[in-house]
Design a protein with these regions (language model features):
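Conserved AMP-binding A3 loop
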Residues: 31-35, 172, 180-206
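ATP-dependent adenylate-forming carboxylate-activation enzymes
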Residues: 63-64, 84-99, 111-114, 247-266
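Structural core segment of the AMP-binding/adenylate-forming
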Residues: 51, 78-157
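A short helix-loop-beta submotif of the ANL/AMP-binding
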Residues: 58, 64-84, 88-92, 100-106, ...
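Conserved AMP-binding/adenylation subdomain of ANL enzymes
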Residues: 203-220, 227-296
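Conserved pre-ATP/AMP-binding loop-to-beta segment of ANL
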Residues: 19, 149-184, 191, 214-220
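Conserved AMP-binding/adenylate-forming core of the ANL superfamily
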Residues: 22-66, 70-74, 91-96, 199-200
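A short N-terminal helical cap/helix-turn-helix that marks the beginning
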Residues: 1-22, 39
Length: 296
């Protein structure tokens, strides 16, 4: 019988590794420590309260991989709602379909994606926020949430007058049968298909990964897969964060040149990828060597 709970993994990891780097944006060099990440999660929980978010409500996320993308995901999971990660390379029709089909209540997007959201697909959406700085891009009723986000630091300091402490990192563990995420695949016919994953599903996968000792404090990982992809979602984000590892996010699937430079700069201990990316990298290296006569 499964006794562990993914949410408690995060609580323990964030407390234990509060001074360690959690996520780095490769292209902007922005770094979230585990303490910073926990702070952002706490601020998002306050925003969710202001939005009236409920347990069964869905929070959709689409955009370039960055530390705030991960913060929204972790905040949604630890709040007890359901996250809907959307692949950033899906076309506009698929993205609008997923927003509507999932009944998303809140949207977090890279700014360029807000321009493609259609009114009909966002009928149930209460508000949308930018993944660059969490400012409010849209709210259905008035400007309450816009004002709330504008003054979020004041609200945060009022909530934690003695400062945000590791002891304040505390998350209620939802039932293992609770739907934690709905991941949409590209499918072979028609629109994207949604796969519901429970807390128990994700806990089992993360627990197994942790048992293999792939991740831990001081372990560097290079995240190149879209976090909206279930493989990247679990192995480039959930499992490393549950173990105290340091994730460097490339933002999108890289070219062979960018990937080679990133590998040389980050020196990752663990890289999770798919055969297509490895093929691109090795093909480029082998072809260059053949053209220069290094390989005969």
């Amino acid at each position: 019988m499964l006794q562990d709970n993914l949410i408690k993994f995060f609580e323990e990891s964030f407390k234990e590794h509060s001074d360690a780097p959690a996520i780095t944006d490769y292209f902007t060099s922005e770094v979230f420590t585990y303490y910073t990440l926990a702070q952002e999660v706490a601020k998002l929980h306050m925003l969710f309260d202001a939005c009236g978010l409920k347990e069964d409500d869905k929070v959709a996320v689409v955009g370039r991989n960055n530390p705030r993308w991960a913060a929204v995901c972790i905040a949604t999971l630890t709040y007890g709602s359901t996250v809907v990660p959307i692949m950033q390379d899906f076309d506009a029709n698929d993205i609008n379909h997923i927003i509507a089909h999932s009944h998303a209540r809140l949207l977090f997007l890279s700014d360029i994606f807000w321009d493609i959201v259609e009114p009909d697909s966002a009928r149930r959406v209460k508000a949308a926020f930018s993944l660059s700085d969490f400012r409010c891009l849209y709210e259905r009723d008035g400007e309450k949430l816009t004002a709330f986000q504008r003054d979020i630091l004041r609200h945060f300091n009022a909530r934690y007058p003695k400062g945000f402490l590791p002891a304040d990192i505390s998350y209620e563990a939802p039932a293992l049968k609770h739907v934690a995420a709905i991941c949409y695949t590209s499918g072979t016919t028609g629109f994207s298909k949604g796969v519901m994953l429970t807390v128990g599903n994700l806990t089992a996968n993360v627990s197994y990964t942790l048992s293999r000792k792939l991740f831990g404090r001081g372990v560097r990982t290079l995240g190149m897969l879209p976090l909206g992809h279930i493989y990247g979602f679990v192995l480039d984000m959930l499992a490393p964060l549950a173990a105290g590892s340091h994730i460097t996010l490339l933002g999108h699937i890289p070219s062979a040149k960018v990937l080679t430079k990133a590998l040389q700069g980050v020196h990752p201990h663990v890289v999770c990828t798919v055969p297509r990316i490895l093929e691109q990298l090795t093909r480029k290296e082998v072809l260059e060597r053949m053209q220069t006569g290094a390989v005969r």
